[in-house]
Amino acid sequence: MSKVRVCFLGTPEFAVTSLKALLSDEHFEVVGVVTQPDRPAGRKLQLTPSPVKALAQAHNLKVLAPESLKANPLMLQEIKTWGAEVAVVVAFGQILTQEFLDSFRFGCVNVHGSVLPRWRGAAPIQRAIEAGDVESGVTLQKMVKKLDAGDIIGIRRVKITPDMNALQLHDVLAQLGAELLQVELMDYVRGNLAPTPQDESKVTLAKKIEKMESQIDWSTSAKAIDGKIRGFVYGPGTYTFLQGKKLKLHRATVTRDGGSIGSAKPGTITAVHEDHISVATGDGVLQLFEVQPESRNRMAIADFLKGHALKVGDQLGV
């Protein structure tokens, strides 16, 4: 059987793993790549290609990087000249038109970072961690116009451990997504696998994370705050205030042994230890292990305490 000709659409590191898998697989030929335009990055804000573009250029692939593929019909015509039989979309970051979806013999397939229909939308990895899910995974779906609503070609699942953060889950899912492409995509193209419809009664939405969500509300539960800290490390992060200055939170854990809580107001420090501080919440106690003061690097609480004389009764969030 001849190689399956693939048009690949993707942008961040999550997509790089999938592109590498296709490039190394003798059953596929990547005939071209579509990605987001170069963006300013680093302290000097130099225009920098997306991770997918950098990999594509290293392999001398054709690359297009439109601001909006939807608004550029001539670019779609150019893509059609590549002769791709299927489009593989992994974290591309743009809405695709029905005309684009209909432009390939085997249609367009998408690697999505959740077990659909749970967590359709822009932030499935972060929302799974934030919600306290005990399982996640990746789905290979046949793309339709409605967001993340296509028939399912294949799924890979993984357990979420209590201390796993979104960056760690991201890396696991990226690898599982690549495995899905190398196995289920080939079965689908050969006609050996029939996609199955999603159960619309089980849909949950993973809305984009807004900056306003990053501030910790200490009146919520310790479990909810811990989930947000671990979930938002892949994205805007989380923060609170200490003595009027912003304090980013990087690593925490829920505990029952948090000092004398009594009727402590949420956000109150209930215990100060060498390697962590305990903070009262609306339900339970949260131990903080790593933080980042304004204009400083991330640091362990032990180092933070050397320059900040915290005591029981001090208040976070003000």
Swiss-Prot record:
Gene3D superfamilies per UniProt: 3.40.50.12230
Give the catalysed reaction(s), semicolon-separated.
L-methionyl-tRNA(fMet) + (6R)-10-formyltetrahydrofolate = N-formyl-L-methionyl-tRNA(fMet) + (6S)-5,6,7,8-tetrahydrofolate + H(+)
Cite the binding residues for (6S)-5,6,7,8-tetrahydrofolate: 114-117
GO MF term set: methionyl-tRNA formyltransferase activity
Q: What class of enzyme is it?
A: transferase
Q: What is its EC number?
A: 2.1.2.9
Q: Which SUPFAM superfamilies match?
A: FMT C-terminal domain-like, Formyltransferase
What are the coiled-coil residue ranges? none
Q: Which UniProt keywords apply?
A: Protein biosynthesis, Transferase
Q: Mind telling me which Pfam families this protein's record contains?
A: Formyl_trans_C (PF02911), Formyl_trans_N (PF00551)
Q: Name one GO cellular component term.
A: cytosol
UniProt record similarity statement: Belongs to the Fmt family.
Function as written in the Swiss-Prot or TrEMBL entry: Attaches a formyl group to the free amino group of methionyl-tRNA(fMet). The formyl group appears to play a dual role in the initiator identity of N-formylmethionyl-tRNA by promoting its recognition by IF2 and preventing the misappropriation of this tRNA by the elongation apparatus.
- List the NCBIfam families hit by this protein, alphabetically: fmt
Official protein name in the record: Methionyl-tRNA formyltransferase
- Source organism per entry reads Bdellovibrio bacteriovorus (strain ATCC 15356 / DSM 50701 / NCIMB 9529 / HD100)
